Amino acid sequence: MSRYRGPRLKKIRRLGALPGLTRKTPKSGSNLKKKFHSGKKEQYRIRLQEKQKLRFHYGLTERQLLRYVHIAGKAKRSTGQVLLQLLEMRLDNILFRLGMASTIPGARQLVNHRHILVNGRIVNIPSFRCKPRDIITTKDNQRSKGLVQNFIASSDPGKLPKHLTIDTLEYKGLVNKILDRKWVGLKINELLVVEY
């Protein structure tokens, strides 16, 4: 299955808030609840929804998610926690969390168009796994800095997670350490994703 390109609000209505997918929010109204099936949710449906939340938030394909679950399963720590750490340390997600892009698809586009440097080298792979002490900057040209400047100016510095720091004057971000579970920007039960 390829990456989702369809209407984003449909996914948000179904799964809840997905800040990585879009900034849009559905209108609050009682008619939203009536459209969907009511009654008892089955275990399969709950697990599927949690998996879909993860997929759409991080912009992953089914195959990519399975690969991350497989890598996390080999780790000695909790599989769900390792899975979230792997996803949060992706370059496109770190750009989104630093405030250099409004959404994860926007961050993917910045990386694909070669506007981003990691430790002084151009990286054009959005799934690049960042490590602690990696320095993420924009290219030293006006166009690259202009793209990131608007997003940094509009981002809230209070929402910046503890494992990242940003220098807004030089358009530079630093990965301090691997993320803790409590700083993940998505309400999700990762154990249900692993069980699925």
Swiss-Prot record:
Protein name: Small ribosomal subunit protein uS4c
Record text on subunit structure and interactions: Part of the 30S ribosomal subunit. Contacts protein S5. The interaction surface between S4 and S5 is involved in control of translational fidelity.
SMART domains: Ribosomal_S4, S4
Source species of the chain: Alopecurus pratensis (Meadow foxtail)
One of the record's GO cellular component terms: chloroplast
GO BP annotations listed: ribosomal small subunit biogenesis; translation
Protein family according to the UniProt entry: Belongs to the universal ribosomal protein uS4 family.
Location(s) in or outside the cell: Plastid, Chloroplast
